[in-house]
Amino acid sequence: MAFRWGTENWNLCWHVRQTGRERYLALALLSGHFHVDLFSTDKDQRLENVHYRGYADYYRQMPLVFSQSRINLNISLKTILTGIPLRVIDVLGCGGFLISNYQEEMQEYLDIGKECVVYENIEDLFLKAQYYLTHEEERKSIALAGV
């Protein structure tokens, strides 16, 4: 299939770019105020305050990362219009505390605010991260309820 402007190919590219921008802005804002570890092989030199931890094996290391992190962040690809991202299930299944962007299906299967937390925009994400980092018992209670 050939690439043509104005087709689904272009829309997908745009959505991926938007997701990358949202992730960058979130990490830049959060790392300016909090200690942020990122498990990724892609290092963005602009994110000077982010602590890159490299690749984490999905089966052996990621469950430990999810369960031991004070906050796990999910920013879904904009191409995921419906459904619950696997990362949400992974984090909750490991007993981790999750802040995620809102996906409509989440409210069908999860008790938002009691099993996980969702944010509306980058500013809301920052405020919720700030709140839950200073409310340890509430954060732990939500993490346990999500299992």
PLM segments and residue spans:
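Catalytic phosphate/metal-binding cores of nucleic-acid and nucleotide-processing enzymes, i.e., regions
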Residues: 122-125, 146
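Mg2+-dependent phosphoryl-transfer enzymes with acidic/Ser/Thr/Gly-rich catalytic loops
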Residues: 101, 119, 140
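Nucleotide-sugar donor-binding catalytic core of glycosyltransferases
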Residues: 1-85, 97-106, 112
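Amphipathic alpha-helical segments within well-ordered protein domains
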Residues: 129-130, 147
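Short acidic active-site motifs
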Residues: 60-61, 124-127
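A short, well-ordered alpha-helix in the C-terminal region of glycosyltransferases
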Residues: 138-147
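Short alpha-helix at the nucleotide-sugar/activated-sugar donor binding site of glycosyltransferases
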Residues: 90-92
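Conserved acidic donor-binding segment of nucleotide-sugar-dependent glycosyltransferases
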Residues: 116-122, 132-136
